[in-house]
Amino acid sequence: MNKKNTIFLNSLYMDFLTENELDLFLKSLDEIWTAELYTNLKQNGLIRHVISKVWNKGQHRITQVFEYESQDSFKKCESILKDAFTPKNCPALAKFVFKIFNNRGIVVSEYKSD
């Protein structure tokens, strides 16, 4: 693997108590993930952010995948997100109850179809 092409990832699961809470969270995405926040993250090395709703029966979960240019970019963006998502700075997020599971890593193998 070429270290120059290494992509740092953060895969995050968010489990909600009910489907209704999860759906309300999804309707609030524009309040939580603002254009200003994305601009700041992009300037600090965020390449991509994906939010997916998990449709496994009996789960009320979303996943988020963050791709970063480098480990340094990850650290900068982690600090930005920590500050952005305080109850004071993001009251829209503060109203939800959920559990977060984080998995951080680097891409070691990837397939892309042409």
Where would I find each of the regions flagged by the language model?
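Glycine-rich beta-strand-turn "strand-cap" elements at beta-sheet edges
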Residues: M1-T6, N44-T63, T86-D114
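Short glycine-rich, basic-tinged beta-strand/loop micro-motifs
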Residues: S11, Q59-R61, S70
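Short, solvent-exposed aromatic-acidic interface loops
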Residues: Y13-M14, K53-N56, K82
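Generic structural motif
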Residues: L17-E19, V54, E69-Q71
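Short amphipathic alpha-helices within nucleic acid-binding modules
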Residues: L22-L24, E69-K82
